[in-house]
Every structure is written in C-alpha cells, then in structure tokens.
Amino acid sequence: EYSAMASMRHLQEHVRPTLMRIYRITAEEADFYFRDMWLVVHSLATLIVTNDCPYSDEELARLLTGFSVSIYKAIREIPGFAAGAFDRDAVFRALAGGDEGKAPVK
C-alpha cells in the first residue's frame, strides 16, 4: 500500500548525505530541511495536478528558492532551530528590531 509519508522518509534517507555534504549541516538539520521543502513542493504539486495553480514557472521557482533560502538561513543562524529548541518570541523580536543580536536557545 502506498504511503506518502513512507515515500518521503525513503527519499529523505537517500538525499540526507548529499544535503549534509553540500550545505554542511547535521543529519538532523538535513532531515528538517528536506521535510519542510518536501511539504512545500507537495503543496504546490496539489495546485498543479488539480489545474488550479495560479503561478507561472518563474513564480514557482522564486517561491521554492525563497523557502529553500529561508529554511537554510534559519538552520544556520538560529541555534536550535531544526530541533525546535529556540525561543520563538525572541527570534521574532530580534527580526522586528526589538532585540539586538541572535535569539537565545531555550
């Protein structure tokens, strides 16, 4: 029987070493990055296969690049991001200019 999540985990195992090598991240971070990008791609795929996608190929490329860069930047710059062990309020305050420096780890 087909399972989308089992398929995702199978592919994740194959892609993990490449992500770790190219992006210089841990296995946990690679799995986090892959999972989040997989969710974005599958959301867009739903729009495409239902013939309800309002975005051009160029817009889709920009969307995917934006998500990819954002996730990678958060992994690299917010300690504990991939593990979910960070202070979300502090991160948003810092991004909004309320605090100086990087967000502390919980």
Name each model feature, range by range:
Residues 28-50, 62-71, 84-95:
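Hydrophobic alpha-helical segments that form the core
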Residues 24, 49-53, 79-80:
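Short, flexible helix-adjacent loops and helix caps
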Residues 1, 13, 46-54:
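Amphipathic alpha-helical segments used for helix-helix packing
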Residues 26-28, 56:
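Alpha-helix initiation/capping motif
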Residues 1-24, 31-36, 62-73:
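Amphipathic alpha-helical packing segments from all-alpha helical-bundle domains
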Residues 77-106:
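Charged, low-complexity intrinsically disordered regulatory/assembly segments
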Residues 54-58, 72:
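DNA-recognition helix of helix-turn-helix
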